[in-house]
Amino acid sequence: MATVRSFDKPFELVDYTEELLIIPNTWGLLNELGVFEADGVAQHTITVEKIDQSLALLTDRVRGERNNMNKDYTRELHSFAIPHFPLDDYIKPEDVQGKRAYGSASAEEQLGMVRGRKLETIRRNHSVTLEAARMQAITAGTIYAPNNTVSVDWYASFGITRKEVDFLLGTGTTDVIAKGEEIIADIQDNVLNGDIVTGIVALCSPEFFSKLIAQAGVKEAYKYYASTQDPSRQRLGSGLYREFDHGGIRYIEYRGKYNGTPLIPADDAYFLPLGVNDMFKTYFSPANKFSFVNTNGEEAYVFEYPGDRDEEIVLQSESNFINMLRRPQVVVRGYTSN
């Protein structure tokens, strides 16, 4: 637990990171599904070694002639910088002086209550940024850094072309299960390491999901699923997401937006495996403070220190993360062109 700053030591910096991380991250479907594993690293770059093993059928040889030769792994090293996301806030005397406490008819506002509300807002801003960044990694295959301080395309970095499947949901004769089977087979073939896939999830735009459940070959199945599971259509979490299990795939409607722009483009759906270790990874690097040099990174940090002339208290926060698709080939883009 951080020690509250003593005003007898006006230049002391107080670490409120622990208090910040106690506030739960309740934002986002990707967080709820646990798609990304998290790992703290001690540097502001990550180095990834790509190892390819080629298998070959052996040919028969005449005894005594030169034998078949085994091929070793091929290795490639890739280094990626971790973007920096700072966020500051301030507590001013007028935030406390003469103010009524929230939810009270007469009690005066307290500094601790103001600080708590600001910490909660800071936490949510970092959480929503992380969710949007993870979704960008899935939909675009790139890292989130809107000011281009860092630029990484996971498909280009690993020389991979993303598989795409047109579901043609506007065509009544489309075999949706066959489309799904094509995607399932492709994902299983590209997992490569022998891990067992516990499920395939499709994160769908509202447009894709609505067309899916209205498609002639799916409509009756969805009616049956909805009526047996939940009369109001089964929804996840806070009730924002409709879901539908069909043909071995769990289709989930994702309605996340930022400034009116959907995080999943209209008519798109993104298919990915669940239960596979180290498939999707978020790396957190340490805060830009001397006391955190060469320490493993946390999800976010916040520090408090006095401002100029005793007129404000500064809350300085930051997060440093990169969302990596360790095997970008297992994310399949589905879409409907009609």
Region locations from a protein language model:
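A contiguous, surface-oriented mixed alpha/beta subdomain in the mid-to-C-terminal portion of proteins
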Residues: 166-262
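Sequence/fold signature of self-assembling virion shell proteins
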Residues: 219-338
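Assembly/oligomerization interface modules of large self-assembling protein complexes
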Residues: 34-101
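Hydrophobic alpha-helical segments and helix pairs
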Residues: 4-27, 151-179
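Long, contiguous amphipathic alpha-helices that act as assembly "spine/axial" helices in icosahedral shell
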Residues: 85-160, 175, 179, 185-210, ...
